[in-house]
């Protein structure tokens, strides 16, 4: 009598292959889910870092605003804070002013501690404008630094005499505070309020 040979039948092999394929697919889906979640988390972390950097630079600029007007195209415009709709060629609100506190250790660089800066919205990007000197010569183009993308609106508000105002028309005096509102595609409306250290002060070079 012949002894039965050991091993798996074709049906058993097919069943084993099907089970292995099912387990492999499940493991792959779990791995893909983990990788996708990790990628989303990294993108959100990068976005939050961009927001933090933009607001940090904005805070440094605004809080160190000084009551000094600058020359534009060779002429003194006598405006301390130029803030308006479509100002600085913005697609929404834009602003420009002179700030202090621009570090120049031991006077190593051929410039002062004052800097002309501006902020605007262009093509859904929040941009920071800066010049090497507070009174740039005619034809000088600013350095344009993109700070945030996916921005749909930029609004400014000005604090004076205990209230927030939607416009700033005083040429030779600074407001006490400035609020910036950004509409973002992913985070909605964000508002930051900044105290201007030189708020209420008039132009140092008014004459």
Curated annotation (Swiss-Prot):
Keywords: Cell inner membrane, Cell membrane, Membrane, Methylation, Protein transport, Transmembrane, Transmembrane helix, Transport. GO terms for cellular component: plasma membrane; type II protein secretion system complex. Residues 1-7 form a propeptide. The keyword Ribonucleoprotein does not apply. It is a single-pass membrane protein. Cleaved by prepilin peptidase. Coiled coil: none annotated. GO terms for biological process: protein secretion by the type II secretion system. It is found in: Cell inner membrane. The chain crosses the membrane at residues 8-29. The keyword Transmembrane helix applies. It holds the Pfam family N_methyl. The modification N-methylphenylalanine is found at residue 8. Component of the type II secretion system required for the energy-dependent secretion of extracellular factors such as proteases and toxins from the periplasm. Part of the pseudopilus tip complex that is critical for the recognition and binding of secretion substrates. PANTHER family: TYPE II SECRETION SYSTEM PROTEIN J, TYPE II SECRETION SYSTEM PROTEIN J-RELATED. Belongs to the GSP J family. Type II secretion is composed of four main components: the outer membrane complex, the inner membrane complex, the cytoplasmic secretion ATPase and the periplasm-spanning pseudopilus. Interacts with core component exeG. This is Type II secretion system protein J. It comes from Aeromonas hydrophila.
């Amino acid at each position: 009598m012949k002894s039965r040979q050991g091993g798996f039948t074709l049906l058993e092999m097919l069943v084993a292959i099907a089970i292995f394929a099912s387990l492999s697919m499940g493991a792959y889906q779990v791995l893909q889910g983990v990788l996708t979640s990790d990628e989303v988390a990294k993108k959100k972390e990068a976005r939050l870092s961009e927001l933090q950097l933009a607001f940090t630079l904005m805070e440094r600029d605004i809080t160190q605003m000084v009551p000094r007007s600058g020359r534009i195209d060779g002429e003194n415009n006598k405006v301390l804070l130029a803030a308006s709709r479509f100002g600085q060629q913005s697609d929404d609100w834009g602003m420009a002013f002179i700030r202090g506190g621009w570090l120049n250790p031991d006077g190593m660089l051929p410039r002062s501690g004052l800097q002309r800066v501006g902020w605007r919205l262009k093509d859904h990007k929040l941009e920071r404008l800066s010049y090497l000197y507070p009174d740039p010569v005619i034809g000088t183009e600013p350095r344009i630094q993109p700070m945030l993308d996916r921005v749909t609106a930029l609004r400014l508000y000005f604090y004076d005499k205990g209230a927030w105002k939607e416009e700033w028309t005083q040429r030779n005096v600074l407001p006490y505070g400035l609020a910036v509102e950004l509409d973002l595609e992913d985070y909605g409306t964000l508002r930051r309020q900044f105290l201007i250290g030189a708020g209420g002060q008039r132009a140092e070079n008014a004459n």
